[in-house]
Structure formats: C-alpha cells, structure tokens
Amino acid sequence: MADSILIAYATRYGSTQEVADRIAAMLRESGLTVDVQPVKQVQTLDGYRAVVVGAPLYMSDWLKEARNFLSRHRATLTRLPVAIFALGPTEDKEKDWTETRKQFDKVLSQFHRLTPVAAELFGGRFDPARLTFPYNLIPGLKRMPVNDIRDWEAIGAWAKSLAEKLG
C-alpha cells in the first residue's frame, strides 16, 4: 500500500463510483497501484502516496460525506498530492455548467489549505428511477428524463494526466 494511490469517492446513486472505477482503471493502465474506497470506509491515509477524491454536486452542494472526508483528513491531505473531481450537471446547458462550476469552486474554497494538483468537474447522470426518499416524492423530478452526460473520453484524459502528476 505504501506506493498506492487512493481514490476515495462519495456517491448517492452509483454514478460517481463508476467514474472512480474508470479513473482507477486508467491509472492502473499507467502502471500505478490504486485502491478505490467509499470515503466513509477510509480510516487512515497512512501508506498512500497520493489521494483522489470525488463526489457529485447534488442540490447545489458536494455530498456531505466527501466534505467530511476532506475535513477529517485535512492534516494528511495537505502533505500529499491530491486531486479532486465532482460530477455536476446532468444537462449539457452552458448556464448549468457555469452555475455548477461556481458551486464546485465554492466547495474547494472551503478547504483553502488544500492545494489540489488537479480539480475537475464532469457531467453527471440523472435517472429518476433511482431516486430515494424524499426526492422520489417530488413530482417534477420523477417526470424528468434519464440523462447521462458523463464524458468518458474527458474522464479518461484527466485520469491519464493524473498518472503523470501523481505517479
């Protein structure tokens, strides 16, 4: 584990885990050793040489467990190379991207002592069939179409750039 890179993620409906797994696969293709874990399961960062953290921006905020992870491990993360990603808009509209980028920048500014080697916002996935309480009770959300604007090529390119920065 001493030479491993940790990818820690928070997810509500599985989309961010899929992105974390893709990033891990790309880093492994570059010859790096990678562990992928939900942020809630990470007890220590001892033995990791770098950390990638990802979570969706959901209802205008990064998932709480991801923010808690950064807070809980703040001291260690300031000494390691860190990359951060977020999944954001589920519709490819310029206004949505602009607003979501502002939200992501606001989240990052809350952790001003962290200086990520990379921070990226990707499109997200929305599937009303996966909604859980209380969101599954909101009629407008239930009527929205399934949409997935995750750009797997962009995610792969970002992961390859991380291999150089974290490797």
Model-found features: residue ranges?
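Glycine-rich NAD(P) Rossmann-fold beta1-alpha1 loop
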Residues: 11-17
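Short amphipathic alpha-helix with an adjacent loop that forms part of the alpha/beta core around
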Residues: 41-47
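Short loop/edge segments at beta-strand edges and connector loops
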Residues: 38
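FMN-binding flavodoxin-like domain, especially the glycine-rich phosphate-binding loop
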Residues: 4, 18, 26-30, 35, ...
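Hydrophobic ligand-binding cavity/cleft-lining segments
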Residues: 22
